[in-house]
Amino acid sequence: MNQSSFTREELLACSRGEMFGPGNSKLPAPNMLMMDRIIEINEDGGSAGKGFIHAELDINPDLWFFDCHFKGDPVMPGCLGLDAMWQLLGFHLAWSGGPGRGRALGVGEVKFTGQILPEHKKVSYFIDMTRVIKRKLFMGVGNGRVEVDGREIYTAKDLKVGLFTDTSTF
């Protein structure tokens, strides 16, 4: 796929299975879709020259997780930021032609050094692909960081996602 950026409407189409074809990777539907747009995606950028993704999520106080996490102390769950990075890694694999359904396979290290609150405006996700395997199993490995309003608050090393044409034994 030659397209290098995606709107929210296009990401929603991906969540419905309308982007990469039947049986292939989808993004989650709302409320679990953790980005509003992909600003840039490529196959040869990033720190390792294996690919790069930059995406954003607009923050507003009405987002579903602020009402339940936590009452009187609203904060976006850190695991949602981690999931967003896995979502983007899987999207990159499908965008680069990988067949199958995306599944998170792990992460080497995650650090949280800040939080996302209702008064913040924008979350930015950055993924540097460090390894892309295109064999029987399509698998991507990458390092990610999350920023809120321009300040780095999460980092993740060795995020792993695979694409599976058969998930019955996974």
UniProtKB/Swiss-Prot annotation:
HAMAP family: FabA. Pathway: Lipid metabolism; fatty acid biosynthesis. Coiled coil: none annotated. The lineage of its organism: Bacteria, Pseudomonadati, Pseudomonadota, Gammaproteobacteria, Alteromonadales. Its EC number is 4.2.1.59, 5.3.3.14. It comes from the Bacteria. It is found in: Cytoplasm. Belongs to the thioester dehydratase family. FabA subfamily. The active site is at residue 69. Homodimer. This is 3-hydroxydecanoyl-[acyl-carrier-protein] dehydratase. GO terms for cellular component: cytoplasm. It catalyses: a (3R)-hydroxyacyl-[ACP] = a (2E)-enoyl-[ACP] + H2O; (3R)-hydroxydecanoyl-[ACP] = (2E)-decenoyl-[ACP] + H2O; (2E)-decenoyl-[ACP] = (3Z)-decenoyl-[ACP]. Necessary for the introduction of cis unsaturation into fatty acids. Catalyzes the dehydration of (3R)-3-hydroxydecanoyl-ACP to E-(2)-decenoyl-ACP and then its isomerization to Z-(3)-decenoyl-ACP. Can catalyze the dehydratase reaction for beta-hydroxyacyl-ACPs with saturated chain lengths up to 16:0, being most active on intermediate chain length. GO terms for biological process: unsaturated fatty acid biosynthetic process. One of its GO terms (molecular function) is (3R)-hydroxyacyl-[acyl-carrier-protein] dehydratase activity. NCBIfam families: fabA (TIGR01749), PRK05174.1 (NF003509). InterPro entries: FabA, FabA_FabZ, HotDog_dom_sf. Keywords: Cytoplasm, Fatty acid biosynthesis, Fatty acid metabolism, Isomerase, Lipid biosynthesis, Lipid metabolism, Lyase. The keyword rRNA-binding does not apply.
